């Protein structure tokens, strides 16, 4: 016999960004709890609103499955004493399992007999097991937490109610200072407290009190309502996924509506309008059929359609205040001069341990010039890089960016163009922030990409130099994101800049304002980002082997990892890697000062390998280079089959080791083949 279980936790208003993750976490924790406690079920589903988290288990067994476990004990020779009686070791073993020596049997394992006992445990009633549901609730973790009243226990928000129903039967449980019942809260303004009749009536009972318990249903309602407005008004609405997910977790009973604002505000840059509506007011942007921004917005009310005109007017009033600010800053900022703003950056702190923004920009300018040469930019592009690096942070001191910090770089581009700067310079000012997330948009121009690289490199090296190195999940200065951006930009543009040599060069610049330190840690940190970019689809041993190669060129590292992963599926992979691994292992014994002496070769197999090594010049794609290396496998095997490398003759031994070391030197630019796993 099965029943349905409902668990609902009523809370104070939750931050929108934690609602969905908390629902998923509750579902997973409950599923794990049921599995660990041998309670089978048909399905499990989650519910959430800003004021509740809930989970429903369908078809829950009314009793645990019985448990039968075998336990292996000491060997027979230890379990029996000289008189053939059970020893203290055997007696202690069975006592620890709650059994007696009468339960012992002997089983043979690999030619020797051991004590075994079988323990049978009857399944408990589900009700008794579910008494631990509060422990499941207590196990939830949150990005922020608080405590209230006299509770010493921290939680995301104060708890107001707890419901635990098994079909229609409430279970008597306590969580913190709350005793469970069947009372849930309806909508804050439209509903009342309501009694949940049974687990399967949960959604209907809440709906009667203007609460849509299913996040998926609220999302579908919002989308349908927006689409209806689109059709009626003949407009297009940007349904931003992130904004949609936030809005649906701000409301329990959604009603979408369209508001408007004075068309005069359309003279402000579109980015300012969109930021004001989307980021600050949680409004959806409205466009005409041609995609042009309209003086309208879509918002979602937490309630029904009653008195909607009053709600619309209130939302319009709040937005106009924001747009007034935007219009004011747009007008006033155009009175400022770029050079004056740049000069003031000397008084703006980049970080108290590192220096000012002006010093950061000075270093970035030097790095950008160096990178522009390395990346092969044209003279015109180099000139644009130099100018952009000289001014690229000026917009941080504008009124607009002070009010809307999301627009840094974006407003820099616009103000730079208005001031007569070249388009390439203005674009680079915007693009230097890219990518702004792990999968974010990349710079499109080489000038912007070089400036972005330079800015991120100085940021990385600067923070490492003063010991502000990320540890664990702690990364307050977003250095992982910056480094991931460095790796992605290099890969996207295919710039073959050796990172180890680049970092060496930057350290040699020895800036007066900051001396770079922690070089090894910086390279390891970059390696970790490359490893992450390779992804779990590339086997771990291949990632490690490639990252341990002697060539640290990001696009090539990624290409070689993919080439090796593809090659690992071929029959030729295992023998080739095993041959190369043997070469690598023996080459470690080579004496550095010894040069190869052809006169010391004793057989044709040595000469053949020497000729192959001498003529080996890796070229072409990563796949082609790997094929060149793997083609040496027969020559290497013949060499080992007919040549004793570690011969007693020291001169010959050192000569052969020098030959293998030369081969390693040439092929380790692809990977450290001795790190590859062929088992």
Curated annotation (Swiss-Prot):
Coiled coil: none annotated. Keywords: Aminoacyl-tRNA synthetase, ATP-binding, Cytoplasm, Ligase, Nucleotide-binding, Protein biosynthesis. One of its GO terms (molecular function) is ATP binding. Its main location: cytoplasm. Belongs to the class-II aminoacyl-tRNA synthetase family. NCBIfam families: glyS. This is Glycine--tRNA ligase beta subunit.
């Amino acid at each position: 016999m099965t029943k349905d279980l409902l668990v609902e936790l009523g809370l104070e208003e939750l931050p929108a960004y934690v609602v969905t993750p908390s629902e998923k976490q509750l579902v997973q924790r409950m599923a794990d709890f049921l599995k660990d406690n041998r309670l089978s079920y048909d399905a499990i589903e989650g519910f959430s609103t800003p004021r509740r988290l809930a989970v429903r288990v369908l078809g829950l067994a009314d009793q645990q499955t019985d448990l039968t476990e075998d336990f292996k004990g000491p060997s027979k020779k230890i379990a029996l004493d000289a008189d053939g009686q059970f020893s203290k070791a055997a007696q202690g073993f069975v006592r620890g399992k709650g059994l007696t020596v009468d339960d012992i049997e002997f089983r043979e394992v690999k030619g020797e007999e051991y004590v075994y006992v079988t323990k049978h445990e009857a399944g408990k009633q589900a009700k008794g097991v579910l008494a631990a549901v509060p422990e499941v609730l207590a196990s939830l973790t949150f990005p922020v937490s608080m405590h209230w009243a006299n509770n010493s226990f921290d939680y995301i928000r104060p708890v107001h109610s707890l419901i635990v129903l098994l079909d229609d039967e409430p279970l008597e449980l306590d969580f913190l200072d709350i005793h469970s019942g069947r009372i849930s809260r309806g909508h804050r303004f439209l509903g009342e407290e309501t009694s949940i009749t049974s687990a399967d009536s949960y959604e209907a009972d809440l709906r009667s009190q203007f609460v849509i318990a299913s996040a998926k249903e609220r999302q579908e309602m919002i989308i349908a309502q927006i689409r209806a407005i689109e059709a009626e008004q003949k407009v297009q609405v940007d349904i931003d996924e992130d904004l949609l997910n936030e809005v649906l977790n701000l409301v329990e009973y959604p009603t979408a509506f369209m508001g408007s604002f004075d068309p005069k505000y359309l003279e402000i840059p579109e980015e300012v309008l969109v930021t004001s509506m989307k980021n600050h007011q949680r409004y959806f942007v409205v466009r005409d059929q041609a995609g042009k921004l309209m003086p309208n917005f879509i918002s979602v009310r937490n309630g029904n359609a009653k008195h909607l005109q009053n709600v619309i007017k209130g939302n319009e009033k709040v937005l106009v205040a924001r747009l007034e600010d935007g219009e004011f800053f747009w007008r006033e900022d155009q009175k400022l001069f770029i050079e004056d703003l740049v000069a003031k950056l000397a008084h703006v702190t980049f970080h108290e341990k590192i220096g000012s923004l002006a010093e950061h920009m000075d270093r970035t300018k030097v790095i950008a010039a160096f990178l522009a040469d390395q990346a092969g930019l044209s003279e015109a592009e180099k000139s644009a890089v130099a100018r952009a690096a000289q001014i690229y942070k000026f917009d941080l001191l504008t009124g607009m960016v002070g009010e809307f910090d999301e627009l840094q770089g974006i407003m820099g581009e616009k103000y730079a163009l208005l001031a007569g700067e070249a388009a390439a310079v203005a674009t680079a000012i915007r693009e230097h922030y890219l990518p702004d997330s792990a999968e974010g948009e990349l710079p499109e121009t080489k000038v912007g990409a070089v400036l972005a690289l330079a800015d991120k490199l100085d940021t990385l090296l600067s923070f490492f130099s003063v010991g502000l190195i990320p540890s664990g999940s702690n990364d307050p200065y977003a250095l992982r994101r910056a480094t991931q951006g460095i790796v992605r930009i290099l890969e996207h543009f295919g710039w073959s800049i050796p990172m180890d040599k680049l970092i060496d060069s930057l350290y040699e610049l020895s800036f007066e304002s900051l001396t770079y330190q922690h070089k090894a840690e910086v390279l390891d940190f970059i390696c970790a980002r490359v490893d992450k970019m390779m992804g779990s689809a590339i086997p771990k041993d291949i990632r490690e082997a490639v990252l341990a190669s002697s060539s640290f060129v990001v696009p090539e590292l990624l290409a070689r990892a993919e080439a090796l992963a593809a090659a690992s599926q071929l029959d030729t992979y295992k023998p080739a890697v095993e041959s190369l691994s043997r070469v690598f292992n023996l080459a470690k014994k080579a004496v550095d000062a010894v040069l190869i002496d052809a006169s010391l070769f004793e057989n044709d197999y040595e000469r053949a390998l020497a000729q192959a090594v001498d003529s080996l010049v890796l070229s072409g794609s990563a796949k082609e280079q790997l094929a060149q290396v793997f083609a040496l496998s027969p020559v290497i095997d013949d060499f080992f089959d007919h040549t004793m490398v570690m011969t007693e003759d020291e001169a010959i031994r050192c000569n052969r080791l020098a030959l293998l070391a030369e081969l390693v030197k040439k092929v380790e630019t692809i990977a450290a083949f001795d790190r590859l796993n062929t088992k």
